[in-house]
Amino acid sequence: MTNTCTPNHKSSYTYEDLLASGRGELFGPKGPQLPAPTMLMMDRVIEMNETGGQYGKGYVEAELDIKPDLFFFGCHFIGDPVMPGCLGLDAMWQLVGFYLGWIGGEGKGRALGVGEVKFTGQVLPTAKKVTYRIHLKRVINRKLIMGVADGEVEVDGRVIYTATDLKVGLFQDTSTF
């Protein structure tokens, strides 16, 4: 992997660390960035490793504290507030990209697809915590750096979304993407 920065190999990250990632400060100027609030879909990363998960190829676990005043509850839907499922899916893509930066990958992260997504529950404003779990299946390190993972979203201890083959790539140039 062409890497001009030292990977930031902590096993957990605070909200301030995640904000630093969004500013391009955590993994260096060429490392992938997380989005800034309000699109940052996690408050902390509580575990990261290169050998864990269902496939033994990497694991990420992160959390989002649910507060009734989160932006989406006021508009999705009026009188029937629920977190959009696409935001949970985006959080999983965010975490795959974060993992690629954590192992030293460089470039701008882009979601490239997902095999299958299932929604079997919802996040309501009465919930307390969302937990995301990412199980890396493989990392491709060629001209394009790409992570492939399975993921799940849990609310208050119950799995409500699952996704297979989440794909995120790191691109040196996104002008023709």
From Swiss-Prot:
Keywords: Cytoplasm, Fatty acid biosynthesis, Fatty acid metabolism, Isomerase, Lipid biosynthesis, Lipid metabolism, Lyase
Any one Gene Ontology molecular-function term assigned to this protein's record: trans-2-decenoyl-acyl-carrier-protein isomerase activity
EC number: 4.2.1.59, 5.3.3.14
Positions annotated as active site in the UniProt record: 76
Pathway: Lipid metabolism; fatty acid biosynthesis
InterPro entries: FabA (IPR010083), FabA_FabZ (IPR013114), HotDog_dom_sf (IPR029069)
Chain coiled-coil ranges: none
Family named by the database record: Belongs to the thioester dehydratase family. FabA subfamily.
Quaternary data: Homodimer.
Name of the protein this chain belongs to: 3-hydroxydecanoyl-[acyl-carrier-protein] dehydratase
Lineage of the species this protein comes from: Bacteria, Pseudomonadati, Pseudomonadota, Gammaproteobacteria, Pasteurellales
The gene coding this protein: fabA
